[in-house]
Amino acid sequence: LVGDRLFVTKYSYGYSKHSFPFSPPIFDKRIMFKSPKRGDVIVFKTPADNRTDYIKRLIGLPGDKIQFIDANLYLNNSEIFKSKVLNKSKIYCGDKLIDVFRFEEKLPNGKKFHTVYLKDYTYQNSDEFIVPKDHYFFLGDNRDCSKDSRFLSSVGYVHKRNLVGKAQFIFFSSDKKIGNIFTFWKWHKSIRLNRSFKKIN
């Protein structure tokens, strides 16, 4: 969420210029590269400007085929099944608190995580995405309120040199409409204890 402060391990996938503050042009390639795992939650620089940090879940590896059919996720022509966890829950979509349905999804490598959808049953379809060499395909867990790799003009496929690191946990979270980590005199109103010191799955 907006207002979350994250601990990110930048060594998880090797190093690129984006591993350093302000992305200095030290080198153009990625060194000591380690391949990320499907299901990792990763911070990356969006390809549109190479400056903005995004945090999303890695779904597609190079060569993978990804498609949504009737709002169900298909990976390499196999459906990623989801089971309902809660009939209704509330989450933030931007600044608005909205009702959602919460599901658990399981990837082929056994990775389980929760996703949320605005409706119990939707009929969302997409074109087939084929991930290019050295690129990755990311999705937000908030499927109906996420700008991610499905939007090719703004995010699209992410090159490995744009990876910043693996998100490990949220160490501080506050409602930015009230205050932030620096306005400590407002913490009693702004801090979100249910999200602070929370491990990222």
Regions found by a protein language model. Give the residues of each.
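Soluble "head" domains of membrane/secretory-pathway proteins
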Residues: V2-N201
